[in-house]
Every structure is written in structure tokens, then in C-alpha cells.
Amino acid sequence: MKFIDELDIERVNQVLNFETIDCKIVGGCDIFTTKAVASDRKLYKTIDHHLDTILQDNESYNLALQQQIALDAEDKNERSMSPGGQRRDSSSFWEQKRRMSVSDSPIYLQHINGNLNESNGAQGEIVADLVPPIIKTSKLNDHNLKELVSNYEAGYSSSSSVESLTHKNKERRTSSLSSTGGKVDKLRADSSTANDITARSVLNDTSRTLNLGPFGPINEPSSRRTFAYLIAILNASYPDHDFSLLEPTDFKRSSIKSFIAKFENSMYSLGRKPEEWIWEVINSHMTLSDCVLYQYCPTQSFLDDEPGHLWSLIGFFFNKKRKRVAYVYLLASRLQLAVNNAIGTPDEMQNEDGTFRNNNTTSFDNNNTQFEGEYDLTYEENAIVDDDDEE
């Protein structure tokens, strides 16, 4: 990538470099073209290999997850089709069947029969035979069954009709329950199959279009190239560091307005009033309305290892139409550390023989002769005393 040197951009960099009472601020705007050079092509190959490794790891993870889903589905099918499960279903069915209400001994409407016999004579007996019995409900047990059969054999109704009626009711209930159970099993099987198909399709789609970070699918060349542009700019700005192993998730996409607001708020907190002409100059070279902003926000920044580092704000304005990337940054570090470095470290203040150098010395220039002396404020008896001091 080629660095673009502009005079008005240099003015922006001068304004963004200053010191406060306790901080040193290093800011600026560097503009690069996306035209690749020989070193960039080598970097692009390294980044492609790194992203291919990430993609392979993701595919292996998806394959293991798909196998686990298939095993879980097989376990569910085995549990639903196991004999123990069927016995449990049948036992629960007969338990419900046992608790169902059945007909007790049939009782005719005697008062109705009596009234009919008194009024109609022989016709009352015929009507009485046609009146259905009132059924008293109770739980099914052996005593009720014997009583029911004996009563019907005595003349209330034929045992064959009772058996046929009971058999029909039993078949109807059994068929309804079996059909309901079959529908439930079919729905469960269909739902499990649909879930498996959905999970597999999602996994396949994920493996084909894996989105890591704000750049889109990493298997597409355009997404990889955009990610490589930012890595190349960081390598050019900080040659002592290697950023080729950064992850796409170390960046995030944000709006340009929010980034400008953060930038100006940081300037306000540092006691500087933001200048509107700064963004006008950047806009003249980048056309911010056509730009996409990627903000560098890793979990652990390389600047954390720098001595005295406090915070940083780094953004990349990418204009695909103009084939340019603007690197806008604002870095803050402690100023006290710079003052201590100016004074000197203990190693720098030590002489060759191991003794420490005394910096409280003065030099006098008298006829091109260097005289070096020290201030000694201790009192000695042999010291020379002026006459004025004795008086």
C-alpha cells in the first residue's frame, strides 16, 4: 500500500500532537491507497493461510457438532421404540381403562312403568320394555362384572348384546387411543427429522458462509482483502510489531458519527476544543459519506505493552470507490514517564568504576578553558574566611 503525503493532512497531524499537564497525546491521520506492492502480496498470502486455518477449524467443529446431533437423535428413537417404553405405555393405558366408568346394574324407571301400567294396562308393559335402563357409574371390578352379567342373564338384556356393546366400545377406545398414539409418534418423528434437517442445513450454511468480525464471509476474496488492508496499515505504522496473526474479531464496524463523537469527546476531556476543519480536510480526501468505518478494539492491544500507555482510539475509514483507507488515531500516555526518562536512569548515571555520577556540577567558560567545580556547603576549620565575614 502506498502512503499519500498531503500538506493539509500534515497540519491535522500537528494539531493532534500535544501535551497536557499529565498526558502526552499522539494523534494523526494517515492516508493509504489500496494498490498492493510486493511486500503486500506476501502479507496477503500469510493472511489467507491464517484465515484458511480458522475456516478449517470451524468446519471440523461443525462436523463434530453434527455427529453429536445425529447420536442424540438415534438415542431418542431407541428410547421411543424400546419394549420397556411400550410396556409403560400399555400399562398406563390399562390403568386408565380400569379407572374408566362403566355401566352398573341396570335399573328401570319403576315409577314410569307403574304409571304406564295403571293408565295403559298392557301397553305399559311394552313401553317399559322399550325404556332404556338408567346406568349408574362406578369403577370397574370383578364384583360389578359378575353382577352385571347375572342381571342381564335374568332378563333385562341378552348377554350377547352386552358383550357386543362392550366389545365395540373397547375396540372404539382402543382404536382411538392407538390412532392418537400413532399420530403422536408420527409427529415426534417428523419433528425430530425436521430438527435434524434444519440443524444440518444451518451447519452447512455456516461452514459455507462463516462471518468472523465485520468483514463478512471470510471465504470471499473481497472480505479477506479488506481485512488485509487494515493489517498492512498497522504493520506500516508500527514496524516493530507483526499484526498478521490478528483475528477479524479484533475489529468492529461502527457508524462514522459515533466515532467522530468519541473523538471529539476525547479532545474535550483533554482540554482541547475540536476543530471542524479537521474533518473537512479528511472529507476532502476520503469522501466520508462513501466510507465504511472499522474500529480497532481487541481484547488485548499491542499498545498495552508500551510503557505509560493509558488509552487509544483507532479507526479506519475505507472508501472502496476511491480505493483509499484513512488511518485516524488518538493515543494517550503518561507524561511523568517522559520526564523521568529525560532525567536519566540509574544505569545512565553510573560511572565506569561503579560510582554514581554527581549531576550537581557547574561549568564555567573562562578564556576557552573549562573549569568544573562543585558546591560544598559544609563548614571546615581550614576554610578561607573573608574579612567582611569576620566583622
UniProtKB/Swiss-Prot annotation:
Residues 86-96, 165-174 have a biased composition (Basic and acidic residues). Residues 356-368 have a biased composition (Low complexity). GO terms for biological process: negative regulation of transcription by RNA polymerase III. One of its GO terms (cellular component) is nucleolus. Pfam families: Maf1. Keywords: Nucleus, Repressor, Transcription, Transcription regulation. It is found in: Nucleus. GO terms for molecular function: RNA polymerase III core binding. Gene3D superfamilies: Repressor of RNA polymerase III transcription Maf1. Its main location: nucleus. Residues 75-96, 159-189, 348-368 are annotated as: Disordered. It comes from the Eukaryota. Mediator of diverse signals that repress RNA polymerase III transcription. Inhibits the de novo assembly of TFIIIB onto DNA. Belongs to the MAF1 family. This is Repressor of RNA polymerase III transcription MAF1. The lineage of its organism: Eukaryota, Fungi, Dikarya, Ascomycota, Saccharomycotina.
